[in-house]
């Protein structure tokens, strides 16, 4: 997909990710608990310092394997760290994210900790996201750079069309970038900045797409369970559709999206269950084409099976809610 995008348009996707995950304590028998190694204090310096031996080990292995580590912080869930590496071509970033996850798994073995990439292991605190930071380049030119110095956050036409393409296909994209039943717990646990509305804005964390800095935007409808090869490939297809058809995303929403809706704005919600997202993907030929050959059939088979097995399960909630019901 990247090669075809370059051949047809001379453009390439550059991407960076924000791989949040939680470090959990192991039980005495070596199996993971649901207890974080730290408390849910965001950007807490002392908690970040407590993680230094673990972080240094991750950094050591990452450097040895060619990852350019640039930044890290403690996020606001138990044991939640985000350690970032530099952006690159989309296919290289996908390789790097996969390598980073394997590094964390190995460090966990060595330090008796469990690296958890489950999107929502706890309710009432932030989930594990994996925001994708996106730009499109042509040679040495970033096509997302703002053409008007007086409006430094507004991308040029190509950037706006790319955003328009993603908004058009966002429901189908969600099935790929939020690819588990558990992913949608993240969307229902409100108040923790998970996006549920198909809109875009400048520094607006209530929308699914956010222009976070001049020259790039943040795709927020994605979590820690994502397969980056599939998500970045699908984003190229969505943006290509937007560019080729000059899809207008509309003006950026600068209000809190909930305030905008109270004022009468009609905003589409993204799918709120995995089944709804999979139905949207079934009906989107552009995004389905991002998984060529037998790939989409295989993805569809296993993901619909996952959803149907969940629907056929009696949960603890069912028992607690209905066991003693007397109609």
What would you call each of these model-derived segments?
Residues 1-327:
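Glycine-rich, acidic/polar active-site loops that bind/position phosphate-bearing ligands
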């Amino acid at each position: 997909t990247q090669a075809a995008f370059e051949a047809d348009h001379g453009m390439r996707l550059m991407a960076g990710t924000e791989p949040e995950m939680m470090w959990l304590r192991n039980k005495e028998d070596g199996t993971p608990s649901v207890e974080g190694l730290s408390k849910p204090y965001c950007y807490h310096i002392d908690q970040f310092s407590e993680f230094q031996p673990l972080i240094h080990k991750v950094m050591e292995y990452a450097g040895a394997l060619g990852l350019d580590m640039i930044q890290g912080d403690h996020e606001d869930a138990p044991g939640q760290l985000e350690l970032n590496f530099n952006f690159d071509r989309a296919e290289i970033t996908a390789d790097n994210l996969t390598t980073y996850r394997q590094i964390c798994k190995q460090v966990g073995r060595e330090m008796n900790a469990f690296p958890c990439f489950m999107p929502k292991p706890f309710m009432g605190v932030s989930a594990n996201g994996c925001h994708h930071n996106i730009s499109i380049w042509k040679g040495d030119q970033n096509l997302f750079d703002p053409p008007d110095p007086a409006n430094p956050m507004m991308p040029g036409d190509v950037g706006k069309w790319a955003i328009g393409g993603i908004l058009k296909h966002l429901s189908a994209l969600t099935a790929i970038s939020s690819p588990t039943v558990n992913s949608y717990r993240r969307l229902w646990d409100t108040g923790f900045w998970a996006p549920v509305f198909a809109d875009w804005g400048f520094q607006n964390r209530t929308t699914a797409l956010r222009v976070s800095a001049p020259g790039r935007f943040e795709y927020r409808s994605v979590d820690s369970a994502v397969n980056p090869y599939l998500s970045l490939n699908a984003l190229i297809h969505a943006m290509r559709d937007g560019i080729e058809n000059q899809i207008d995303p509309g003006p950026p929403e600068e209000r809190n999206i909930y305030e905008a809706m109270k004022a009468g704005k009609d905003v589409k919600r993204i799918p709120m269950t995995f089944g709804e997202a999979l139905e949207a993907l079934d009906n989107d030929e552009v995004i389905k084409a991002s998984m060529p050959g037998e790939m989409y059939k295989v993805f569809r088979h296993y993901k619909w099976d996952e959803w149907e097995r969940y629907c056929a399960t009696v949960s603890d909630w069912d028992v607690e809610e209905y066991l003693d019901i007397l109609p």
